[in-house]
Amino acid sequence: MVKIRLTRGGAKKRPFYQIIVTDSRNKRDGRNIERVGHYNPVAQGAESRVVLNMARVEHWVKNGAQLTDKVRSLLKEVSKTQATAA
């Protein structure tokens, strides 16, 4: 099963996550199919908190990929900010 989920990076006490498409059997930081965005939970100032390639996310969801709970909430956050910006 293909999932869209987070993989951790960054330094100790300063996490940074890549939003990736991967097989559910792969390790958290293991092999991925495609990187579709990133999430910085400790963003400050002009740094962006969430960046997603919405076209690619929609493509993968249409092809059967499942979102994890956290990625689903980030997707809602991005769609809200895009709706208020437009």
From Swiss-Prot:
A molecular function GO annotation: structural constituent of ribosome
Entry keywords, A to Z: Ribonucleoprotein, Ribosomal protein
Family: Belongs to the bacterial ribosomal protein bS16 family.
Full protein name: Small ribosomal subunit protein bS16
A cellular component term, taken from the record's GO annotations: small ribosomal subunit
Any one Gene Ontology BP term: translation
Pfam short name (any one): Ribosomal_S16
